Amino acid sequence: MTMTERLLEATKEIWDGYNETPFVKGIADGSLDHEKFKYYMIQDYRYLLDYTKVFSIGTAKAKNLDAMRLFAGYTHSILDGEMDIHRAYMTRLGIAKEEAEQTPVALDNLSYTSYMLRVAYEEGEAEVMAAILSCALSYEFIAKKILAEYPAADKHEFYGEWVSGYASDSYHEDNEVLADLMNRLTEDYSEKRKQHLVDIFTACSRYEAAFWDMAWEMRQ
């Protein structure tokens, strides 16, 4: 079993609950109130700014050129790739960049990013990867599960772009690169170190679940 497979197996119960949250269900069937999605977009925009910092710290923590290049590449990819989905929706929702950047970060969001940043600053490259992977892989998991249950969800006039973006082949390929690096970094890890990575990944998976609930309730 690879390290990535172990992480996913350990968090299966948490992940199976993602698509049962009211927010994700609303995206899936197209019924989600646009105000809730607007709130989510702003909070996720703020989240991604710190998420990118975690990748940047990973660049500094990397012990070889391949890992350094990967972390640095993803920093660029998020800022100029994934953020494009957000910018497109922000335009449609009438959200100015200034509004997004000046909106207070919700407590659940702040707790999540603070945890990831602490792991990144205090620990090594594999631990950074464990903190990163839950978000990256779970969005693909959610989008593909939506399509399995609602095959036309990627054609929805409003939420289709969100679903298709995270269910795309290119997003999957990016995730495969991340998972492969995690597996290579941990080939010689002790059981104790591997379990620590499971603990980090599990914590971030729980934070992901809380984020969906936060978005539904529009918590402050």
Region locations from a protein language model:
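Alpha-helical bundle segments that constitute or directly flank the non-heme di-iron/ferroxidase center
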Residues: 12-17, 31-61, 81, 130-140, ...
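Active-site-proximal alpha-helical scaffolds that flank and shape metal-associated catalytic sites
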Residues: 6, 68-173, 202, 206
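Short alpha-helical hairpin
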Residues: 8-32, 51, 179-188
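Basic/polar N-terminal segments that are highly enriched at the extreme N-terminus
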Residues: 1-5, 9, 220
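Short loop-to-helix capping motifs
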Residues: 64-65
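Acidic, carboxylate-rich catalytic segments that either coordinate divalent cations
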Residues: 197-220
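Long amphipathic all-alpha helical oligomerization modules
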Residues: 168-202
